[in-house]
């Protein structure tokens, strides 16, 4: 359980940094993310394992957006995030391109999914229902089909 909390804290910390438009690209490509990924046991495999299962979603936002709900393996997703980050840190011609809309969106989507997988689902209602109102706009004339 402690590991899941660490992964959740990592995901929320970094998704906040990627969402913040004032974040300098140096803060995103510096070694701190690598340190966090390695501490959690994520592997830098250039995205090969993730690509085998999800194709171009390893680097393309539109592709990832289509399959993100199918991703349930925390270590696989974490390794994909680490590998994508490493691309910008080491191989990209311009590391500042990590700030481009599509690249930033890829990280936000992947890190958000990692946060959901490792933490409590914020969309599940917990508590006691006090009142409910159901409204239907379905009009029917005659017997139900």
What spans do the regions from the language model cover?
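Compositionally biased, intrinsically disordered low-complexity regions enriched in proline and serine
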Residues: 4, 9, 19, 26, ...
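Short, flexible coil/linker elements and helix-boundary hinge sites characteristic
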Residues: 19, 35, 41, 54-55, ...
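Amphipathic protein-protein interaction modules
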Residues: 56-112
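N-terminal non-cleavable signal-anchor helices
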Residues: 8, 16, 68, 72-75, ...
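Polar low-complexity intrinsically disordered regions enriched in Ser/Thr and small residues
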Residues: 14, 38, 44, 50, ...
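Short amphipathic alpha-helical segments that mediate assembly, nucleic-acid/protein binding
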Residues: 1-8, 21-26, 30, 57-64, ...
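Amphipathic alpha-helical binding modules
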Residues: 91-144
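Short terminal alpha-helical segments
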Residues: 1-51
């Amino acid at each position: 359980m402690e590991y899941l909390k660490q992964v959740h804290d990592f995901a929320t910390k970094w998704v906040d940094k990627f969402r913040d438009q004032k974040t300098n690209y140096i803060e995103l490509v510096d070694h701190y993310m690598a340190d966090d990924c390695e501490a959690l046991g994520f592997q830098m495999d250039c995205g090969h394992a993730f690509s085998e299962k999800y194709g171009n979603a390893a680097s393309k936002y539109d592709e990832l957006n289509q399959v993100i709900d199918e991703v349930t393996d925390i270590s696989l997703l974490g390794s994909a995030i680490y590998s994508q980050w490493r691309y910008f840190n080491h191989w990209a011609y311009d590391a500042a391109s990590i700030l481009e809309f599509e690249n930033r969106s890829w990280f936000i989507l992947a890190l958000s999914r990692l946060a959901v997988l490792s933490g409590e689902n914020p969309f599940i209602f917990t508590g006691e229902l006090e009142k409910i109102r159901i409204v239907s706009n379905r009009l029917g004339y005659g017997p139900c089909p």
